[in-house]
Swiss-Prot record:
Entry function: This enzyme is essential for phage DNA replication; it is believed to function in the removal of DNA-linked RNA primers. It is also necessary for host DNA degradation and phage genetic recombination.
Enzyme nomenclature, EC number: 3.1.11.3
GO molecular function: DNA binding; double-stranded DNA 5'-3' DNA exonuclease activity
Originating organism: Enterobacteria phage T3 (Bacteriophage T3)
Name of the protein this chain belongs to: Exodeoxyribonuclease
InterPro entries, per the entry: 5-3_exonucl_a-hlix_arch_N (IPR020046), PIN-like_dom_sf (IPR029060)
Keyword ATP-binding included in the entry's annotation: no
Catalytic activity: Exonucleolytic cleavage in the 5'- to 3'-direction to yield nucleoside 5'-phosphates
Length: 302
């Protein structure tokens, strides 16, 4: 089976009605397998080479996939998707050219692209790569609406915590081994958490000064607003000063109004905060048209 895009995958899956589908992080699985199969060799004195045993890497990859597939009885025999990242990233093109710019270039394992070419011909897996999308986005599009791709339920399999932002699926978080059941409510919460906290690894800072304390704010949101007052004593008597005062939101104010207010205190405009949210967003089914390849950027009202 050749490498597919999402439209081709959709067409192949028309008429299917599987109980579940396993959506795996192909980028991560292949990199891990090949890295574990690398070794140094010297063919002549003083000259060393980095080598990769592709047969060993292939076996490691197959064993990893098998271990996840058999994690639960209900997953055995389910269709398997391996998602891969395109060379062009929509976040750089449409949102911020500096997205992931501070990441050090990671050298691919030896023979990486040749290994992929062979993998793409395997019949056991659906290998999918979509123009301008990261593998994460491919996974998000499929997992957030598996019924569009011939399955009643999707399970995401990855070590990346950012998949907590994908609704309507289960997520096997390989870092902890936990299986998380995700709803739209929990996924939206995690997306806003990432928007406020930021992710310097991916090159977006969030709202300065918050970090992990964004959790407490989202669980008990509030408004902060500037209040001016005139000093009545001291050497600066008569001067006007501005303090940011915290209060509960009124009945007309939304969570987004609260987020805007803490952003304003940090010197950010609403559009700058939205930009953080767009970089934090893994695409969901309704945010990508795989027929005409159109991306619908997230807004707080979308």
């Amino acid at each position: 089976m050749a490498l597919l895009d999402l439209k081709q995958f959709y067409e192949l899956r028309e008429g299917c009605d599987d109980k579940g589908i396993l959506v795996m992080d192909g980028d991560w699985l292949v990199f891990q397998a090949m890295s574990a199969a690398e070794f140094d060799a010297s063919w002549e004195e003083e000259i060393w080479h980095r080598c990769c045993d592709h047969a060993k890497a292939r076996q490691i990859l197959e064993d990893s996939i098998k271990s996840y597939e058999t994690r639960k009885k209900a997953w055995v025999g389910a269709p398997i998707v391996l998602a891969f990242t395109d060379s062009v990233n929509w976040r750089k093109e449409l949102v911020d050219p500096n997205y992931k710019a501070n990441r050090k270039a990671t050298k691919k394992p030896v023979g990486y692209f040749e290994f992929l070419e062979a993998l793409f011909e395997r019949e056991e897996f659906y290998c999918i790569r979509e123009p301008m999308l990261e593998g994460d986005d491919v996974m998000g599009v499929i997992a957030s609406n598996p019924s569009a791709f011939g399955a009643r339920k999707a399970v995401i399999i990855s070590c990346d915590k950012d998949f907590k932002t994908i609704p309507n699926c289960d997520f096997l978080w390989c870092t902890t081994g936990n299986i998380l059941t995700q709803t739209k409510e929990t996924a939206d919460w995690w997306h806003l958490f990432q928007t406020i906290k930021g992710d310097m690894t991916d090159g977006y800072s969030g709202i300065p000064g918050w970090g992990d304390t964004a959790e407490g704010f989202l669980n008990d949101p509030f408004i902060v607003e500037p209040v001016e007052s005139v000093l009545k004593s001291g050497k600066n008597k008569g001067q006007t000063v501005t303090k940011w005062v915290k209060r509960a939101p009124d009945a007309t104010e939304t969570l987004w109004d609260c987020i805007k207010s803490i952003g304003a205190k940090a010197g950010m405009t609403e559009q700058e905060i939205i930009k953080q949210g767009q970089m934090a967003r893994i695409l969901r089914f309704e945010e990508y048209n795989y027929i005409d390849k159109e991306i619908y950027l997230w807004t707080p009202r979308s």
